[in-house]
């Protein structure tokens, strides 16, 4: 990953809410927004300690943060999350819907419980996060939803459930952008490829030609980096930097878009 100069505090005075911000991509997004001066609502579902560690790390950047527990698959919990965020900071400017789960399973083995678990978090929750964001954001705010490169990939076996759950989010994004435009709120989605997180550690072998369970991580990284012109796989900071741009006033003319974040990888 390229080094950078000290980051200007270009989001000073803004308040951002990031779901699933206690680890992985969500943590990377929260830290990049905080480096630029935004105050952060760090949402988590069950892992309080990692979320509080993110809050502590944000505090070291000079920005403010609070961790708020909420199960975003439950709409009353989504409502409470936004109300607590507003009570703490007074307003909201940026909402990033990051939480998600991935599953690989043969189509004939997918159960109703599998379907509900994946779509409740990856799809339904994102709809209601965006809905509440629209209601509570200040005019000129930013909504960023989470799709995946998988939504438009072909040739990945046993991935229909996950791919479908993310493809729906891309439809949400284009429609929400139209609905929110009169308030100058932009709505975009990002679609990352493989990013070095715990989800990557568990599932990335599926994307490697001839990949197998238990494959050494070094081989997985090498196999996926071979598809990327930049010669590496992504880390959460890469995704966070793009979200930080989408959160900035300079990004206003980027609206209703799904931004592929693969480093130019061809798979």
Swiss-Prot record:
Keyword Oxidoreductase carried by entry: yes
EC number, UniProt record: 1.1.-.-
Active site: 147 (proton donor), 148 (proton donor), 162 (proton acceptor), 166 (lowers pka of active site tyr)
Keyword annotations from UniProtKB, A to Z: NADP, Oxidoreductase
Entry keyword annotation includes Cell membrane: no
InterPro entries with a match to the protein in the record: NAD(P)-bd_dom_sf, Sc_DH/Rdtase_CS, SDR_fam
Residues reported in the UniProt entry to bind NADP(+): 25, 45, 71, 98, 162, 166, 195, 197
Any one GO molecular-function label of the UniProt entry: oxidoreductase activity
The family this protein is said to belong to: Belongs to the short-chain dehydrogenases/reductases (SDR) family.
Protein task: Hydroxynaphthalene reductase-like protein; part of the Pks2 gene cluster that mediates the formation of infectious structures (appressoria), enabling these fungi to kill insects faster. The product of the Pks2 gene cluster is different from the one of Pks1 and has still not been identified.
Protein name in UniProt: Hydroxynaphthalene reductase-like protein Arp2
Lineage: Eukaryota, Fungi, Dikarya, Ascomycota, Pezizomycotina
Gene this protein is translated from: Arp2
